[in-house]
């Protein structure tokens, strides 16, 4: 599974577990819905770690716990994948 696919699925799973929409997740995380929507719809394959941290904070989850999921056991990096830290 590609890393961006695993991250997308994890976000869907978290929103489902919390019983909230992606729009509500963006609001509770303090990030623009357009940012989350663009990533989730595949228009963008990158999400900054800062944005991911805000998503975690919006659900009272530690960043390290986001990656403690079987989805991340066998991920593959995309070609030319960039990691942005802001």
Language model regions located:
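A short, Lys/Arg-rich alpha-helix, primarily the initiator
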Residues: 1-20
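The alpha-helix within a helix-turn-helix
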Residues: 15, 26, 56
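Residues within the helices of the helix-turn-helix
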Residues: 12, 23, 53
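Short, charged recognition helix plus adjacent turn
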Residues: 1, 38, 67-86
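Short alpha-helical DNA-recognition segment
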Residues: 19-38
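Short, basic-rich loop-to-helix N-cap that marks the start of a DNA-contacting helix
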Residues: 43-54
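Intrinsically disordered, low-complexity basic tails/linkers immediately adjacent to helix-turn-helix/homeobox/MYB/SANT
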Residues: 57-68
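The DNA-recognition helices of helix-turn-helix-type DNA-binding domains
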Residues: 32, 43, 70-74
């Amino acid at each position: 599974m590609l890393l961006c696919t695993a991250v997308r699925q994890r976000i869907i799973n978290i929103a489902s577990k919390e019983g909230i929409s992606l729009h509500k997740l963006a609001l509770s995380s303090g990030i623009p819905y357009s940012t989350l929507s663009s990533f989730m719809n595949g228009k963008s394959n990158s999400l900054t770690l800062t944005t991911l941290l805000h998503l975690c904070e919006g659900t009272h989850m530690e960043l390290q716990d986001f990656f403690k999921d079987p989805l991340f056991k066998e991920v593959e990096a995309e070609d030319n994948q960039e990691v942005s830290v802001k």
